[in-house]
Amino acid sequence: MFLAQEIIRKKRDGQPLSEAEIRFFINGIRDNVVSEGQIAALAMTIYFHDMTMPERVALTMAMRDSGTVLDWKSLSLNGPLVDKHSTGGVGDVTSLMLGPMVAACGGYVPMISGRGLGHTGGTLDKLEAIPGFNIFPDDNAFRKIIQDVGVAIIGQTSSLAPADKRFYATRDITATVDSIPLITASILAKKLAEGLDALVMDVKVGSGAFMPTYALSADLAQAIVGVANGAGCKTTALLTDMNQVLASSAGNAVEVREAVRFLTGEYRNPRLLEVTMALCVEMLLSGGLAKDDADARAKLQAVLDNGKAAEVFGRMVAAQQGPTDFVERYDSYLPAATLSKPVYAEKQGIISAMDTRALGMAVVSLGGGRRRATDNIDYSVGLTGMARLGDKVDTQQPLAVIHANDEESWQQAAEEVRSAMVLSDKAPEVTPVVYKRITE
C-alpha cells in the first residue's frame, strides 16, 4: 500500500519511482482518490526532475491501462493494425488521405483522433464538416468498420485512457504541459490503447509546431520512439516541416475538399504529398506490408492511381453515417462561406518566412477553430490557395483566398494573414519537408 504524498516526496527528492508506485498514483487519478493538488505536485516534480526510461514506460503503460485497451484478436484480421499520430500544425490534413491509402494497401487503421485547439486544426473537426459524419460510433460499430473498410477515424471515448484526461486538465492550468515525459505518456497512452502493432509519429518542426525549437521536437520524437518500443509497439518518427502551412488550405471544409481532390488525383500539393507518402511508407514498412521504401512507394502510388484509396475514403464516410456518394459529390455536401475573396500583400516581394501559428490563429478568428475547448466551430471558413515560401507576391498575386461569413471577420483575417508573411527581395533557403527519420 502506498501513500500519494510519499510518492510525490520520493520524486521531489530526485529518486526514481517504481512501476508499482506509478501505477498506484495513476489509478488514484482515475478513481478520484488522488487530489488535484497532488496531481499538480507530482507533475511539477516530474517537470523539474525528468524521468528515467523505465519510469516513462511505466507511466505510459499505467495511463494506457487506466481504461479499456482494444483487443482485435476475435476479428482475425489479415493484416497489421497501424496508426499515425501528429503533434499538430496548420493545414495538416494527412490523416484523411493516409488512413485510406494504408487500408487500401492491406493495413487496418483504427485512428482515434482529436479536436483542434489554439492554432492547430483537429481531424475530428474536419470530418464533422461532412454532413452526418459520426465520430463516436459504439464499440461494435467501430470494430465492424475496421473489419469491413480497413479504416475508421473516431474521437476518444471516456473509456480510453481516462486517467490522462484528468492529469492533462491539471497540467494545463499548472504550467506543466511542456514536460517531455508527460507529453510522451499522454500521447502514447491513447495510441497504445488502440491495440496497435505499429505506430508512426509525425513530429512537427518550425513556426507552426507544438515544440518551439528543432532540438525540442527531436527530443520529443526520440522519447516517444523509445517509450513506445519499450512498451512493445514498433514505432518510428519523422521530423517534418511546419514553417509554412502544409496543405494549400487551412480550415475544416476547405481541407476536406483538398483531401478528396488529393485522393482522386484532381490536385496534389507537392509538400502534402511528400509528407503523406513518407508517413504511409513508415506504416507499410513497420506493419510488414512492404519489403523496402521503393516497394512501399510503388504500392501507395498504385492505390492513388487506380482509385482504390479514394474508394476506401468514400466507404469510410458512408460507414460513419456520412453521404454514400460523398467522393463524387463532395462540393454539394460541404458547407461554403458566403464571402470568398483574395488577400494581397501591400507591396511586392518574395515570401521569405511565415508565422504559421499566426496563420492558424487567423482561421480561429474567422470562427474555424477554438480558443477554448467549449467553443463552437464554423466549418465553412478558412484559407485556400495559400502562397508558399519563395513565392513572389504583389498587388496582383494573392497571399491566400479568405473564406469568411462577414466583411468584418474577413478584414481581421486579412490583417492577420498579411502580418504573418515576411517579404524580402531574395528567396529563402530551401529546407527539407522531412528533416529526419528517428528509429530506436
Curated annotation (Swiss-Prot):
<dbReference type="Pfam" id="PF00591">
    <property type="entry name" value="Glycos_transf_3"/>
</dbReference>
<dbReference type="GO" id="GO:0005829">
    <property type="term" value="C:cytosol"/>
</dbReference>
<dbReference type="InterPro" id="IPR018090">
    <property type="entry name" value="Pyrmidine_PPas_bac/euk"/>
</dbReference>
<protein>
    <recommendedName>
        <fullName>Thymidine phosphorylase</fullName>
        <ecNumber>2.4.2.4</ecNumber>
    </recommendedName>
</protein>
<dbReference type="InterPro" id="IPR000312">
    <property type="entry name" value="Glycosyl_Trfase_fam3"/>
</dbReference>
<dbReference type="InterPro" id="IPR013465">
    <property type="entry name" value="Thymidine_Pase"/>
</dbReference>
<dbReference type="GO" id="GO:0046104">
    <property type="term" value="P:thymidine metabolic process"/>
</dbReference>
<comment type="function">
    <text>The enzymes which catalyze the reversible phosphorolysis of pyrimidine nucleosides are involved in the degradation of these compounds and in their utilization as carbon and energy sources, or in the rescue of pyrimidine bases for nucleotide synthesis.</text>
</comment>
<dbReference type="GO" id="GO:0009032">
    <property type="term" value="F:thymidine phosphorylase activity"/>
</dbReference>
<dbReference type="InterPro" id="IPR035902">
    <property type="entry name" value="Nuc_phospho_transferase"/>
</dbReference>
<comment type="similarity">
    <text>Belongs to the thymidine/pyrimidine-nucleoside phosphorylase family.</text>
</comment>
<dbReference type="Pfam" id="PF07831">
    <property type="entry name" value="PYNP_C"/>
</dbReference>
<dbReference type="GO" id="GO:0006206">
    <property type="term" value="P:pyrimidine nucleobase metabolic process"/>
</dbReference>
<dbReference type="InterPro" id="IPR013102">
    <property type="entry name" value="PYNP_C"/>
</dbReference>
<keyword id="KW-0328">Glycosyltransferase</keyword>
<dbReference type="InterPro" id="IPR017872">
    <property type="entry name" value="Pyrmidine_PPase_CS"/>
</dbReference>
<dbReference type="InterPro" id="IPR017459">
    <property type="entry name" value="Glycosyl_Trfase_fam3_N_dom"/>
</dbReference>
<dbReference type="Pfam" id="PF02885">
    <property type="entry name" value="Glycos_trans_3N"/>
</dbReference>
<dbReference type="InterPro" id="IPR000053">
    <property type="entry name" value="Thymidine/pyrmidine_PPase"/>
</dbReference>
<dbReference type="GO" id="GO:0004645">
    <property type="term" value="F:1,4-alpha-oligoglucan phosphorylase activity"/>
</dbReference>
<keyword id="KW-0808">Transferase</keyword>
<comment type="pathway">
    <text>Pyrimidine metabolism; dTMP biosynthesis via salvage pathway; dTMP from thymine: step 1/2.</text>
</comment>
<comment type="subunit">
    <text>Homodimer.</text>
</comment>
<dbReference type="InterPro" id="IPR036566">
    <property type="entry name" value="PYNP-like_C_sf"/>
</dbReference>
<dbReference type="InterPro" id="IPR036320">
    <property type="entry name" value="Glycosyl_Trfase_fam3_N_dom_sf"/>
</dbReference>
